[in-house]
Amino acid sequence: MMTRSRHLVWVALFACAGAGPVAGQDGFGAAVLAPAPDEILVLKPAFGRGAASVLVFERGGSGWSQVQELWSAGSLLGESFGRTMAPVEGGFLAASGDPQVMIGAYGFARGADGAWAESGALPLRAEAAASAEEMSMGRVMAILQPPARVVAADGDVALVSAPGGQGAGTEVRIYARGADGTWSAAGALEAGDLRANARYGAAMAVRGGLAAVGAPGQGSSGTVYLFARGADGGWTRQAALATPALGGGAGLGSSVLFTGDDELAVGAPSADGSVGRVVLFARGPGGGWSETAILLPSAPGSGQRFGTALAAAGDELIVGAPGAEDGRGRVDAFTRVDADGGWRAAHAFAPGEAGLVAGFGSALALRPGLAVVGSPASEGSAGLAAVYEAAEDGSWSGPVWLRAGAPPVAVTSAEVRCEDDRAAGFDCADVDLQAYLPLASIGAEPGERVSDAWGWTDPETGREYGLVGRSGGAAIVDVTDAVNPVYLGVIPANRSGARDLKVYADHLFFTGDGAGAHGLVVFDLTRLRDVADPPVEFAPDLRWDGIGSAHNLIIDTGAGTAFTVSTSGDGHTCGGGLVMIDIRQPLAPEFAGCYTDTEGLIFQGRTHDAQCLVYDGPDMDYRGRELCFASNETALRIVDVTDKSDPRPISAAAYPGVAYIHQGWLSDDRRYFFLDDELDELVGTTDRTKTIVWDVTDLDDPVVIADYYGPNNATDHNLYVKGDRMYQANY
């Protein structure tokens, strides 16, 4: 019979497992489709909260509800989708976002039972391109923000734009669907000479035997290339459309849409200082194309980006302006007034009074009586989609807001045992759930996220507190009664997506990255002994302005030294290395010194994280010295910082296949250092979570002695060691 050791672990699950380094924002609403009057598809291209997916909504007696979630083979492995979808007969295509750029798009088809399922992929190449290139920032960004792919389709023809062709860096590939439903490569659409940054294939459309490919960076104002399919099935370039009168940098071709067999609408969202325009073109009797009209936004204002997205149904055309209304967004509707391509402004869709809406109009879908508007930047880029419906008299109602999944529900009052590998909806193995508080339960507004957690035990009362880094500050939760946690309040600070929190001498210290003049915030935790009527907003005891923003914070509690790393903005930065701060008097910090390394990936000298302590390990040469074990992106660096005016590097070590040395922690006896490399899983140098074990008994010569492989391919992020147990946070 199996028995369990009862170790209580308080984990910051508030953000939900899976937030990647760049993809903490899901972007739900980046693309939308309405394949049927009572059905809507919404793309969630990133994996901030669960795998990237397409969510299916149906209209029932009680309104719109999610009925299915679709994943690709790639998204189930942690890959993103692109940001476009295209309908095809019996299904749709969703652009891929795999970092290896092996897949152009994934196909989905409706089964006999009406449910959707993946139906195959449109491959770009058979295997990933081999690369002998060492890890660089360029490779990192290609992994974290994979090259964009765009998909368009009509009938049995699909177009995919992807990196790799022509001098401008992209190519547009043609795919044909066979009788068995599989897609195969059928050539490419070649525009001819393209300049660098033409962004060829940024937007595409297909209708019958015509294809339109936008290149918003080509020429002075952007260009759209038109191709026609011949009797032999081959495609030839027919025209290059431009409107120089729009002015330089207009971005013509950022969106394209056939509004008829001989009509084309083209967005130029950067025209006129990013107010935006939509240019209408028509094919004449002789086969030539010419400009027929230019559509303007329904209201004045700069930065509207009118023309970012287009959708049409019958004699209705809608145009997205996601920058309108101070970034909230708007969608303008137009009605055809004559057969010669004339359009008039009809009405506008607005997000109403809903809070935290941003980028409304970034994606559109339209069918008679139904409009769907994507708003992927809303709620902190978690994303929203809005549904509008028309009455018989032509009036529109809405919005009805769609979100990715039901809001999480708090789990409190009683322990939930792990049974059949599940506990209250979470996967588990030999770990029972004491409680779960979603973001809303710790005071977070929609769109906030959580990026770090620490803890404090009151030495007088024995009460335990969780300290949680929220976008809007540091949230404090009393976890003394583990199954009944109580949210006490928040210490507000400049908004940040990446915080670090540590405790010294009964004081909380925390930082924020990318948060301007955030400073080092200090809060006396003994104030928690008498909190009336929680939750409350706590005023910090100090904001030390010796630094601006910082990615991570380390505290050596033995020496009373704080270290910020990857520090930026005003104040001390130390080139991204160790900013040393004397905090022996918590409310009177003093700058103590700098250490800037020669290692680094994002830039030379950048330290990502560290563990610093008064060394009490086996290497007698350094006993009693204050040392930092620094994760410096490309190497593990051990530094003697006892003399803050003259820190001395002791050693640096790496290993074959290093991708990004992120963080690590010493064993309690100081003989071993356990390290996580954040990117090795993502770049493919390991197929499972790998923890690297160093023998550091000789600090002058650290040696890798083992690798521990986890049971899945999650990316390792942070780990801590207490006694004979290691606690890892992976995504």
Predicted regions and their residues:
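Bacterial N-terminal signal peptides that target proteins for export
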Residues: 2-9
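Feature marking well-ordered beta-strand scaffolds used for ligand recognition
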Residues: 22-731
